[in-house]
């Protein structure tokens, strides 16, 4: 067993003990994690053990990334399988998905991780036009079937620039091609208007402008933390992200927003 692995193991274990011991008892036990574009459920691999050690039941969906409606339907199925109230967590494009799927009655809280948070009637392409294009956007390439991928250069320099190089290259190699049509899907409900929200701003994000993330968080009146992270804080700062999700599980489930 390598020294690097042992260091990571004990660091994650210590973080889990800290999270589990911190604060009030859990009000919600179920957490559904929704990945973003060019990713899959394994993007939560560093957060899941921390949440489980805190006593939470975790499901990470595997969305097809074929359309917003397909991804919402997949996420709703995961929500329906839970045995009680749910905290719904979305990363990046996954914020579009949880904004729509979050209207499900079982969902009692929403956590956005460097994620889009549209209003009803908006598509991803409608968001952020008032800000300069993020650098990583220039590294997105379409294929002949209309699916999008990020170049290896884009992943290394703009998607996950604060991860070890080996992890960055794995993300580039395993990314899920995303149908461009998914970015044109409009949400019909903005669940964040009715349910408690939390937001992780990634201040070094090069895929979504950090100021746009701050704008989303402010519009939702979300409990917000800001991390000096790339676009993937759940991989570069898993302890901080897990701690916020645990907070949501402890504080959700008793009221709707504004009550």
Show which residues each predicted segment covers.
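Bacterial N-terminal signal peptides
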Residues: 6-16
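Active-site catalytic motif of lipid deacylating hydrolases and related acyltransferases
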Residues: 24-84
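Gly/Ala-rich beta-loop-alpha elbow adjacent to hydrolase catalytic centers
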Residues: 89-94, 98
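Active-site nucleophile elbow and catalytic-triad environment of alpha/beta-hydrolase enzymes
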Residues: 170-192, 203
